[in-house]
């Protein structure tokens, strides 16, 4: 009988073993950008015909915007880029081991590139940048007015990511294979859709978790084909209320109800049938919506004193980072959402997507 009594111990270990945190358990790939953020006025937005709450890619008419922003307003520089922000927040929430999170993207060989490398190292992220000298490191102007932020990304180097020159190299691809969860912001579909698909295929075939973000309304509008090519491989889709509405319109869902949109998105065709798709839409200070195969649930965000909110830029990225930090350990989805709300609540009290030394999440 003694043997039978001792049996539960090894069994318990078996359950916990696959959930142990380790290096490179989370993989992210995206556009590494240096954020140049400032509180601006309505005149500045109007001058460059910017919407208060939007994300766009810089065009010729925005050339002067970056210079004017630096000259006219008090600017702050922060290491940014949507995916990179999320990956850093996830690593911060995980704490140990360092380098639990991996990040790929393209930078220039310049001062801004050096800043991004230093900041990634300080955040204990295992960043492997593709470095090239044809284009300078990308920047993103974050024009803040009140609760809103208008983002204008000048991708530059970020746009030069090459699958065959970086992702396909054995030493880099090995890091993708080590990951249990992969996360890519939809923004990267404008740069290297073939890289996104390669990672998505790999995840689907090996029953890893592939997660994607709708990222901005223009992705659903102008990169619809790339987005829908990858959608069958998406296990978890993130987005905010504006992106969800645009996606629904582009897909002909004929509803403006966010819960209905989440439900219809959840039901889109899916490759890996072992994992049912989960759709998560944040709505700023309103409830976060989660659709699973069986139900749609609303989760209230944490109460926040409006006076404490300094900068909502990065809140969505932080939510994803918090969520992923628990997902890699196989925590329940409700815990993942709670961690996402926690991370976002910390980030909006600070400028840029920055955080204190240690999280206080229990």
Curated annotation (Swiss-Prot):
Widely expressed. Highest level in placenta, liver, muscle and kidney. Pathway: Purine metabolism; AMP biosynthesis via salvage pathway; AMP from adenosine: step 1/1. Adenosine binds at residues 35, 306. One of its GO terms (cellular component) is nucleus. Signal peptide: none annotated. Activity is inhibited by 5-iodotubercidin and 5'-amino-5'-deoxyadenosine. A motif (Nuclear localization signal) lies at residues 8-16. The keyword Cell inner membrane does not apply. GO terms for molecular function: adenosine kinase activity; ATP binding; deoxyadenosine kinase activity; metal ion binding; RNA binding. Its cofactor is Mg(2+). Mg(2+) 2 binds at residues 147-148. CDD domains: adenosine_kinase. Its EC number is 2.7.1.20. PROSITE patterns: PFKB_KINASES_2. Mg(2+) 1 binds at residue 49. Binds 3 Mg(2+) ions per subunit. Changing residue 318 to E: In HMAKD; complete loss of adenosine kinase activity. It is an enzyme of class 2 (transferase). The modification Phosphotyrosine is found at residue 77. It catalyses: adenosine + ATP = AMP + ADP + H(+). GO terms for biological process: AMP salvage; dAMP salvage; dATP biosynthetic process; GMP salvage; purine nucleobase metabolic process; purine ribonucleoside salvage; ribonucleoside monophosphate biosynthetic process. It is linked to Hypermethioninemia due to adenosine kinase deficiency: A metabolic disorder characterized by global developmental delay, early-onset seizures, mild dysmorphic features, and characteristic biochemical anomalies, including persistent hypermethioninemia with increased levels of S-adenosylmethionine and S-adenosylhomocysteine. Homocysteine levels are typically normal. Catalyzes the phosphorylation of the purine nucleoside adenosine at the 5' position in an ATP-dependent manner. Serves as a potential regulator of concentrations of extracellular adenosine and intracellular adenine nucleotides. This is Adenosine kinase. It comes from Homo sapiens (Human).
